[in-house]
Amino acid sequence: MSKTDWNASGLSRPSPSAHWPSRKPWQHGQKYQTTQDRTEPPARKRRQAVRVSANHASQQLDQLKAVHLASAVRDLEKAMTTLKLWESPQEISRHQALGYSVIMFMITAVKRLRESKMLTLSWFNQALMVIAPSQEETMNLKTAMWILANLIPRDMLSLTGDLLPSLWGSGLLMLKLQKEGRSTSS
């Protein structure tokens, strides 16, 4: 069979059906090497394991945490609305005179967390400046943020900003603040 066959695409190109001899040039007196004459099998590429970069794996983990955080925030929002409905009329009238209760601060924080996905120390400080004259409201805000920090799973706290991770696990500090708040308001 000749190297150049007639084919539809052109005269000078070899036909894809033509069998090529071995890579060694043919010399007079030698016969072509067939596939049965070859002693070694053709070299095969080894399959390589797919490697996922640490950065990609970290991004996937962060995305998964963000999804779980969104679910936790939705659950907290449902719980807060339920708590608000369970509040007694006496508590509501007392809080109206006072301003914000712990539950109201938690509802506000959860809404902010749902909308902006961040609770920052600067937001917390601004809220403290607004309610500064009232010691009880200040304690309610601190208590609400501490409770929220302990309700959200610890591995997701880093996604919520810098406020909640700094409050997580500071139970002794909160008890001390509550005692100070009660002693000054009494």
From Swiss-Prot:
GO biological process, one term: symbiont-mediated perturbation of host autophagy
UniProt keyword Protein biosynthesis present: no
Keyword Oxidoreductase in annotation: no
GO cellular component, one term: host cell nucleus
Region named Disordered: 1-45
Pfam families: Paramyxo_NS_C (PF02725)
Disulfide bridge partners, by residue number: none
Subcellular location: Host nucleus; Host cytoplasmic vesicle
Location, primary (coarse class): host cell
Biased composition (Polar residues): 1-15
Family: Belongs to the morbillivirus protein C family.
Protein name stated in the entry: Protein C
